[in-house]
Amino acid sequence: MVIGTPVTTPLSKIVRTPSRVPGSRRTTPSKIREEKILVTIRVRPLSPKEQAAYDLIAWDFPDEQTIVSKNLNHERHTGPYSFDYVFDPTCSTSKVYEQGARDVALSALNGINATIFAYGQTSSGKTFTMRGITESAVNDIYGRIKLTTERDFVLKFSALEIYNETVVDLLNRESVSLRLLDDPEKGVIVEKQVEEIVKDEEHLKTLIGTVEAHRQVGETALNDKSSRSHQIIRLTIESSIRENSGCVKSFLATLNLVDLAGSERASQTSADGTRLKEGSHINRSLLTVTNVIRKLSCSGGKRSGHIPYRDSKLTRILQASLGGNSRTAIICTLSPALSHLEQSRNTLCFATSAKEVTTTAQVNMVVAEKQLLKHLQKEVSRLEAELRSPDPAASPCLRSLLIEKERKIQKMEEEMNELKRQRDLAQSQLELERRSKKELKGSDHHGPSRQVVKCLSFTPEDEEVSGASLSTNLGRKSLLERQAAIRRSTNSTNPSMLVHEIRKLEMRQRQLGDEANHALQLLHKEFASHRIGSQGATETIAKLFSEIKELQKISCIPEQIEIKDKASLKEEIARLRSQESNIASLEQKLENVQRSIDELVMHLPSCHESADSRTAPSKKKRVLPFNLSNTSNIPNIIRSPCSPMSPSSCNIVEGEIENRAPPECNNVGSAGDSFCSQLSTPVKSKDDNCTPGSRQSNSVNMKKMQTMFKKAAEDNIRSIKAYVTELKERVAKLQYQKQLLVCQVLELEANEAASDEADISDQSPLSWHLVFEDQRQQIIMLWHLCHVSLVHRTQFYMLFKGDPSDQIYLEVELRRLTWLDEHLAGLGNASPALLGDDAAGYVSSSIKALKQEREYLAKRVSSKLNAEEREMLYVKWDIPPDGKQRRRLQLVNKLWSDPLNMQNVRDSAEVVAKLVGFCETGEHVSKEMFQLNFVSPSDKKTWIGWNLISNLLHL
């Protein structure tokens, strides 16, 4: 045994946790130790004064756990009181200690806090009992220390009293009132309290004697030496274990020996003046103790409500002992005299409440960090070994439980899938109902069906972009941009419905040819039937008419569009592919028509000159192609078609087709005849008798008529030219829609062979690795060009390492960035090198967001990294020590700055992940967070970085 100076271990390393106690026969439980307060009752003999007054004994003791009133006053019987132990007047103090306090006192040697205090009315024997308990505890503690040779113990002694709510240090009587402070590690502590290191057993007994001599004592009518203050003796025990005998460094615990002052009545003690003031303070503090015990007993020791610890300094100091980290024993002392029956009952009520209070005692270990880590590793290894080799008797039971759990999980997954299917079905039905109501209000039945519109589901912004791209590069990039949207609804599309939509688009294409045919018929009649214009213009019109007829023959398809439920998609695809040459021929023919119209426009000046050279008599009979009063209706007869995706335009076109009849041409002709007859009447009636002046007037009128006709013809030809141009665009758009549907059909067939393709892809890991590296390099470069958030780059780079399942995410990310780069290039903002300081629009906002993000990361350098880590990073990234703030900014500005340097990319990802805590959370980040979303953007507030850039996808 060695008793010396205390070990200077910081209190921050005190670990209060259950642990196996080396060198002890008893092992603490594997969880927090919860136990009731040990409550015992000790009844003293009658005092000489009580015997002289012939006072009677009012209590009986049926056994060692029960006390019952004799009811000598013939009051209402209260019944027996049961406790852990009940000691009658014949029991000695040593027996009280052995059965009611010894186990609690010795637990302090094993690192568990312990408290023993006496409670009772004045002159009931509290101080007498606590003196014997203290002496026996000191003897037992030193006896156990002598037997425990593998540990070194250090004891510290301190004592205080609470006199009139004033805390006084009993080891330093010259000290004034001491303050109580709250310490986050120790709890409530007494400021400037003296703590003596105990040298040996005799030294400890000397200190105890000194403390008792310094305590406040006074005389009352009931007791010559009545304690006028609450005394608390605290013994701190730190037991250090040798390095080779255990896993923990040392145990640290406190033993509190509390001698409370007794409750008293002024009528019995005959107190006045100072004694009366002392008694009032004593009663007030004991009342607070009673309230705390009652509150704790009602909640089972758990602090579910407010516990009034701060109402008294006594309860504040003993807060941990009354319901916290401590083992507690309460010895309630009683006077057996009948004259003190009321106070004895109050004491028994207090004891009854106290035995319901639960404390949570724990082992307080002072552990070195390395030893604690080693101990925890051993504990983990032990638990893993137990898991690997479980109890054979429990294995079948566990196996059956696992099977049952798996069965339940599988059943729940099936139910979830069924619910999802029902949800999707309900949503589709709701969408169908909504679209059907819109169609009833005026939509065209020849337009795309509800299901196909839902499958394509393009936003108006997407259609504008697609319209612009169709005019330059129709089939390639737009198709790639739409395939992602088509895949989302491929599985839910009926094959027969797809074939039906293809046929309807072809019928629309055929109707466009009919419109062109009708327009050229009007123009042909204008030039051929009425012999207006030169011979070249007439031949040009005839050529146009023959080419349109040929176009109709090429694009002719059967009128049957009713498809059976089980239509062959493969046959339809083969038929469409065979028509690809016809589509190309159709476009070539339209180009020829365009050139012919241009030639016709070039003929107009020559026609005008030839008309001027002719004489007026030869032009007596002229029929204008259109009534001049109806010139404003020409755009209604020859109308430029609208977009095929517009329901309103479809209604206009189909209305013209349905309402157009053969008499329409006759109406035009009759209008022209009536107009010409009105003009030619004077010329025809008096041809021979005309004077030269009248002939000259007629010649002027004919020139005016020719000029008016020329203007009308020019307007008609320009209308046809614009119409043919628009017709080309509509044919292209129809062809594009057919390609979309064909892609959707091919996607259906591709899904059937998805499993085979997966097997093939698994068989070639080397090729996939090369593709992965190439795609990732492209994505990194596009990140740099599009000013993508650094956090998004880091998360994407660290999540996708080349697993075959990452292919879809890389493809989606690459397409999204490609689209964004093309969109910015279309605005003239392809890269920051071209922007300089004059960035505008979305590029400028993205650059601003990226700058704000770098400033945010620079602030986190000091908070997330210690000085050593920061210095290592500065050296690694070659940052000169010009200043702390500048170095942080230089470090952050170098992150993700070189997309061609993969080492820079890897190091940047590691630094950003450490700064944002991406690598510290330990949680699984879902890869689905990077999937491409085609729905409309929400109104939620976006964060800096990728969210701002991702909003560009919905332009």
Swiss-Prot record:
Source species: Nicotiana tabacum (Common tobacco)
UniProt-recorded Gene Ontology molecular function terms: ATP binding; microtubule binding; microtubule motor activity
Protein name per the record: Kinesin-like protein NACK2
Function comment: Probable plus end-directed motor protein that may function in the NACK-PQR (NPK1-NQK1/MEK1-NRK1) MAP kinase signaling pathway, which is essential for somatic cell cytokinesis, especially for the cell-plate formation and its expansion. May regulate the activity and the localization of NPK1, probably by association through the non-catalytic region of the kinase.
Record family assignment: Belongs to the TRAFAC class myosin-kinesin ATPase superfamily. Kinesin family. KIN-7 subfamily.
CDD domains membership: KISc_CENP_E (cd01374)
Top-level taxonomic group: Eukaryota
Keyword terms of this UniProt record: ATP-binding, Cell cycle, Cell division, Coiled coil, Cytoplasm, Cytoskeleton, Microtubule, Motor protein, Nucleotide-binding, Nucleus
Binding site for ATP: 120-127
Gene Ontology biological process: cell plate assembly; microtubule-based movement
The UniProt record lists the keyword Cell division: yes
InterPro entries: Kinesin-like_fam, Kinesin_motor_CS, Kinesin_motor_dom, Kinesin_motor_dom_sf, NACK_C, P-loop_NTPase
Coiled coil: 366-443, 566-604
GO cellular component entries: microtubule; nucleus; phragmoplast
Subcellular location: Cytoplasm; Nucleus; Cytoplasm, Cytoskeleton, Phragmoplast
Gene field: NACK2
Induction of expression: During the M phase of the cell cycle (at protein level).
PROSITE patterns: KINESIN_MOTOR_1, KINESIN_MOTOR_2
Domain Kinesin motor: 36-357
Entry keyword Electron transport: no
